[in-house]
UniProtKB/Swiss-Prot annotation:
Organism superkingdom: Bacteria
Gene assigned in the entry: dnaK
Molecular function (Gene Ontology), one example: ATP-dependent protein folding chaperone
PANTHER family for this protein: HEAT SHOCK PROTEIN 70KDA
Biased composition (Low complexity): 575-599
Phylogenetic lineage: Bacteria, Bacillati, Bacillota, Bacilli, Lactobacillales
CDD domains reported in the protein's UniProt record: ASKHA_NBD_HSP70_DnaK-like (cd10234)
Keywords recorded for this protein, A-Z: ATP-binding, Chaperone, Nucleotide-binding, Phosphoprotein, Stress response
Protein name: Chaperone protein DnaK
Length: 615
């Protein structure tokens, strides 16, 4: 079975890992970094992902970041020039980039992946993530909750221990708390809670708002109306936030941020850690509630927890660490790299699927309750939140009116008592119910949740055995036909991108060869014949012409011709140098022989010394 890669598809950064032997290993990207910015940019028909895309975010308005915040929103589209992209398509571009460099590292095709999602992602968001994987050419073998994956990374070498751990996962855009029980290789999730719209981006935005407010007060100019200025502020805010994890004050310097009546204006200020804590106090407070809820749902207290694990780059913020310690009564365990733990855990789960990791069982839970709408708009739960998955539950309902020929099944997910306040996952209808008074027909509604947290619902008339089923797919906003079209487009773009990269590489090789040729000709002009020099010059000029005409095939052919001529010339020069060296060596030997007959040569007398003589 081929390798299954583990992908942490993050809001701000993503990472990929693979199991090598018994240990998971992070795969570095082409820039040599262990994480890749979850950023996509479009320019001149070319798509760029990662660090390259992030670097041009200031100057290129067609740059997309933090798309994960919109996963599962069927109405959200990103408009780039004349085309609209869904969150799944943008995410697929990130996944495809990760897939490509994972393949380069492994030296083989990658077609399977375990992808992580926030524990509090609903069905729509999970399905959208799975669709993104499919568009990128990946079969998503398993969707794993991020805190659960981090627990796998933490606990792989502790399979003989019995522990209860609390995973506090604060990433770039989402926040989760999960409580797990580890014992005999079983990783059982007891409860999960969180906020899918809380993360490092929100901390950045607090700094940005503060900078905008102060600059407006000092200069009367609202920087929030200037797109380019806002991007510079975002970069500066992110840097200041990171700096404040290690220092008590961060300097923010943005020259020429705006133009005033008297000329250019500069933003020069400092942000203390105390002020940053004040600005973000409400965000830190928001992290405490899910901790309490997760403990309550698991029926545990702080005293029952053995370890607290921090995951996600935003847990490096000192105020967050202090809040975790104050709320749980435990000093957080920082043995796991917060940026890499999730991807490492996903790779371990990939190893469990392939059979490379044995004696490990992962029991996850559904984060939100599932049910249907019943009479009066009430939400009737069939599966409660924090139920271990996979699971199945059925309940019998009846008709609400006499002679009712059909029932509408409105599938929902959430915790509110009224249907209208919860998330609609899908609707379907069971028809041809025999005529009967209200309350007589027996309609069995059955919910199935698979290991990925994907929901299947069926309704069956127990009197006639007529059944109708629905797999909740449409909630992600994409039909099978749309996904197939996007898969096809992604493959076409992949081929075009590959061709474009090959062209760029070829042009770079040609430039390097032309430079090397001119340099070589200067060095060897007096050492080779005029005919040889001319043949190289002609080949060089032919390559330059092909380069100017952008004729790729001709460039390849002429490059190969010139390369051969340069190599032949280099071999000849090397042989000449070798012959000259040999001749010089022979002359040296002759001189040495002559010197032995010199009348001034003195023969030395040597006396053998007995080692015992001086004892």
């Amino acid at each position: 079975m081929s390798k299954i890669i583990g992908i942490d598809l993050g809001t701000t950064n993503s990472a990929v890992a693979v199991l090598e032997g018994k240990d998971p290993k992070i795969i570095t990207n082409p820039e040599g970094n262990r994480t890749t910015p979850s950023v996509v940019s479009f320019k001149n028909g070319e798509t760029q992902v990662g660090e390259v895309a992030k670097r041009q975010a200031i100057t290129n308005p067609n740059t997309v970041s933090s798309i994960k915040r919109h996963m599962g929103d069927a109405n959200y589209k990103v408009k780039i020039e004349d085309k609209e992209y869904t969150p799944q398509e943008i995410s697929a571009m990130i996944l495809q980039y990760i897939k490509d460099y994972a393949e380069s590292y492994l030296g083989e095709e990658v077609s399977q992946a375990v992808i992580t999602v926030p524990a509090y992602f609903n069905d729509s968001q999970r399905q959208a993530t799975k669709d993104a994987g499919k568009i990128a050419g990946l079969k998503v073998e398993r969707i794993v909750n991020e805190p659960t994956a981090a627990a796998l990374a933490y606990g792989l070498d502790k399979l003989d221990k019995d522990e209860r751990i609390l995973v506090f996962d604060l990433g770039g855009g989402t926040f989760d708390v999960s409580i797990l029980e580890l014992g005999d290789g079983v990783f059982e999730v007891l409860s999960t809670n969180g906020d899918t719209h809380l993360g490092g981006d929100d901390f950045d935005n607090k700094i940005i708002d503060w900078l905008v407010e102060n600059f407006k007060a000092d200069n009367g100019i609202d920087l929030s109306q200037d797109k380019m200025a806002m991007q510079r502020l975002k970069d500066a805010a992110e840097k200041a936030k990171k700096d404040l994890s290690g220092t008590t004050e961060a300097q923010i310097s943005l020259p020429f941020i705006a133009a005033g009546e008297a000329g250019p204006l500069h933003l020069e200020t400092s942000l203390s850690r105390a002020k940053f804590n004040e600005l973000t106090e409400d965000l830190v407070e928001r992290t405490k509630i899910p901790v309490r809820n997760a403990l309550a749902d698991a029926g545990l207290t702080n005293a029952d927890i053995d370890e607290v694990i921090l995951v996600g780059g935003s847990t490096r913020i000192p105020a967050v660490k202090e809040a975790v310690k104050a709320e749980t009564g435990h000093t957080p365990n920082e043995s796991v790299n917060p940026d890499e733990a999730v991807a490492l855990g996903a790779a371990i789960q990939g190893g469990v699927i392939t059979g490379d990791v044995k004696d490990v069982v992962l029991l996850d839970v559904t984060p939100l309750s599932l049910g249907i709408e019943t009479m009066g708009g009430v939400f009737t739960k069939l599966i409660d939140r924090n139920t271990t998955i996979p699971t199945s539950k059925s309940q019998v309902f009846s008709t609400a009116a006499d002679n009712q020929p059909a029932v509408d099944i409105h599938v929902l997910q959430g915790e509110r008592p009224m249907a209208a306040d919860n998330k609609t996952l899908g609707r379907f209808q069971l028809t041809d119910i025999p005529v009967a008074p209200r309350g007589v027909p027996q309609i069995e509604v059955k919910f199935d949740i698979d290991k990925n947290g994907i929901v299947n619902v069926s309704a069956k008339d127990l009197g006639t055995n007529k059944e109708q089923k629905i797999t909740i797919k449409s909630s992600s906003g994409l039909s099978d036909e749309e996904i197939d079209r996007m898969v096809k487009e992604a493959k076409e773009n992949e081929a075009a991108d590959k061709k474009r990269k090959e062209e760029v590489d070829l042009r770079n090789e040609v430039d390097q060869l032309l430079f090397q040729t001119d340099k070589t000709l200067k060095e060897v002009k007096d050492k080779v014949s005029a005919d040889e020099v001319k043949s190289v010059e002609d080949a060089r000029d032919a390559l330059k012409k092909a380069q100017e005409q952008s004729d790729i095939n001709e460039m390849k052919a002429k490059k190969d011709e010139l390369t051969k001529l340069i190599q032949d010339m280099s071999v000849k020069l090397y042989q000449q140098a070798q012959q000259a060296q040999q001749a010089s060596g022979a002359q040296g030997d002759t001189s040495a022989n002559n010197s032995t007959n010199d009348d001034n040569t003195v023969d030395g007398d040597f006396k053998e010394v007995d080692p015992d003589e001086n004892k």
